């Protein structure tokens, strides 16, 4: 859970039909009392009128037309306060989908996008994320946090329930709230149905949604260049597949059938779900962070097969520090790096680094307390912030830590330490070149080492920055005038940087010597990229 000012929201307890569950609380500013409901109490109905949505805000999945609370009377309304850089917010999406399926048109879910980062305030960027994650309910751009403040939200995600009479029932923060919300929503629908006050008819915005772009690549998240073997691996994330091409763009193979799923097999039958980071263990073995499958996949480039080595598709908060890899349930792995016989994993969902040993087939906690933060120190004491990019110079592991807009340096082996090269806090971000603590990045998702320098995908600034790890000096290398749109990853080969230019649905190629940026044209004579 993302916490504003570091203050966690303490949930009260409530009794519902004799079952003790984590409870809702009243929104700050509406009422100071916790919501406590016992089995013998007749009603869950709220008492405080829900604050109206301000006029003239941008709406998504409504054709641009605003939604009013008045027209939602007769429905249970669930407000989901989120920000699109927050991984915990995306963990809530499957719960929202389950709730919508349970209650159909009796429940209306409204996404209230209240941005943390400056770039997240842009409606066009929110639209891209709505597409990437398949969000089909209405979303309002609460860019100045007016709705957030009116409802007293304090952390991302926060979920607020409004009853069919238009009154606030309560709210709860953090992921993992499905059981509570399901009980409360179900009870409200039962209560108001008995009073003849439920409107089960679909509303006017039902079925309105954005159209997905028809492009060869769809929101590619990461890229891996292999200069020695003239290969380029592309995580074609929203097509749920890996594309293998030459460095000049000739498509050699497509790995995965393009449908979301967790299935092993040959290239044509294997399935991925929103794959991200990749790394080569050797010329014949590619590892993939299969992010939405909460799995690590191994691709045999000779046999042309895909095998799951860790994860079973379920996401949990990992409390054990070591376990057999195949039986492990992971938490949103976003990047991988193979070094000296060990696979390092950026476990973004719980702000830690893990490791996989192919010889023992075990997975172990490597670094991070699990607390979201930017604390340096020993491997066990250090904290990370949604780590999403990994690289190495052979001596150190370098980590792109986006929620702290930071770059971290991590030693290898027992007794190693974690040091911050760039970044000062979870809410310290911007676009400032300079040295050390004066530098400001904005939600950097990618990093690669090349020719003595660290190149950073400064994602929300839509730039590529270069960092000298010894002096901590950062300078802008490319971008800033529309060349990129939220690049998620990058990799180098020879004189070129290859950039996953995510929102432009392309791979960009940057000449390191001249700085010239061009689109990598994919040559696909066998039509391997065609979607089924």
What are these regions (language model features)?
Residues 127-162:
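Short, internal strand/loop/helix patches
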Residues 226, 232-238, 286-291, 345-349, ...:
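Conserved beta-strand positions in repeat-built beta-propeller and related beta-rich domains
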Residues 163-222:
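Thiol-/selenol-based redox modules, centered on thioredoxin-like
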Residues 81-98:
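Conserved redox-active cysteine motifs that mediate thiol-disulfide chemistry
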Residues 199-221, 249-276, 305-334, 362-386, ...:
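Gly/Pro-rich loop segments of beta-rich domains
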Residues 225-229, 280-283, 338-341, 392-395, ...:
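Residue-level detector of Asp-centered blade-edge/turn motifs that repeat once per structural unit
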Residues 31-69:
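N-terminal "domain-start" segment that seeds a small globular fold
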Residues 106-121, 135-145:
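Thiol-based oxidoreductase modules, predominantly thioredoxin-like and allied folds used
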């Amino acid at each position: 859970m993302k916490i504003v000012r570091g203050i966690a929201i303490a949930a009260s307890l409530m009794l519902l039909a004799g079952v003790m569950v984590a409870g809702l609380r009243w929104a700050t500013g509406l009422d100071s009392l916790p919501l406590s409901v016992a089995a013998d109490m007749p009603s869950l109905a709220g008492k405080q009128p829900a604050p109206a949505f301000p006029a003239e805000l941008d709406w998504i999945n409504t054709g641009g037309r605003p939604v009013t609370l008045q027209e939602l009377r007769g429905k249970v309304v669930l407000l989901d306060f989120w920000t699109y850089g927050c991984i915990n917010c995306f963990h809530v999406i499957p719960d929202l989908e389950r709730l919508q399926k349970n209650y159909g048109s009796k429940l209306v879910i409204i996404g209230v996008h209240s941005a943390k980062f400056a770039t997240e305030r842009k409606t066009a960027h929110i639209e891209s994320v709505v597409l990437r994650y398949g969000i089909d309910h209405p979303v309002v751009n609460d860019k100045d946090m007016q709705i957030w403040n009116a409802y007293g939200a304090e952390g991302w995600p926060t979920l607020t329930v409004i009853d069919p009479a238009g009154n606030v029932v309560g709210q709860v923060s953090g992921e993992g709230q499905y059981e509570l919300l399901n009980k409360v929503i179900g009870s409200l629908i039962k209560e108001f149905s008995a009073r003849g006050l439920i409107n089960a008819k679909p509303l006017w915005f039902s079925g309105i949604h954005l159209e997905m772009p028809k492009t060869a690549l769809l929101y590619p998240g990461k890229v891996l260049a292999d200069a020695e073997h003239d290969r380029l691996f592309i995580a074609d994330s929203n097509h749920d597949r890996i594309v293998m091409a030459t460095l000049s763009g000739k498509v050699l193979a497509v790995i995965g059938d393009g449908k979301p799923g967790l299935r092993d097999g040959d290239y044509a039958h294997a399935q991925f779900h929103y794959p991200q980071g990749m790394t080569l263990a050797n010329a014949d073995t590619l590892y993939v962070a299969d992010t939405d499958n909460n799995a690590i996949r191994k691709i045999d480039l000779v046999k042309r097969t895909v095998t799951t080595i860790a994860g079973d598709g379920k996401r949990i908060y990992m409390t054990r520090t070591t376990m057999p890899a195949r039986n492990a349930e992971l938490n949103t792995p976003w990047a991988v790096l193979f070094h000296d016989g060990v696979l390092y994993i950026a476990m973004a969902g719980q702000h830690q680094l893990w490791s996989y040993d192919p010889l023992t087939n075990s997975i172990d906690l490597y670094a991070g307390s699990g607390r979201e933060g930017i604390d340096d120190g020993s491997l066990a004491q250090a904290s990370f912030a949604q780590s999403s990019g990994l690289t190495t110079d052979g001596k150190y592991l370098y980590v792109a830590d986006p929620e702290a807009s930071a770059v971290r340096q991590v030693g290898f082996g027992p007794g190693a330490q974690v040091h911050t090269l760039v970044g000062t806090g979870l809410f310290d971000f911007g676009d400032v070149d300079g040295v050390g603590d004066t530098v400001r990045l904005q939600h950097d998702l990618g990093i690669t080492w090349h020719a003595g320098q660290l190149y950073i995908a400064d994602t929300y600034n839509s730039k590529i920055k270069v960092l000298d790890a010894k002096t901590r000096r950062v300078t802008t290398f490319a971008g800033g005038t529309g060349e990129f749109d939220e690049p998620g990853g990058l990799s180098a080969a020879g004189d070129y940087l290859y950039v996953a230019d995510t929102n432009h649905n392309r791979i960009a190629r940057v000449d390191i010597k001249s700085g010239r940026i061009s689109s990598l044209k994919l040559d696909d004579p066998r039509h391997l990229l065609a979607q089924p």
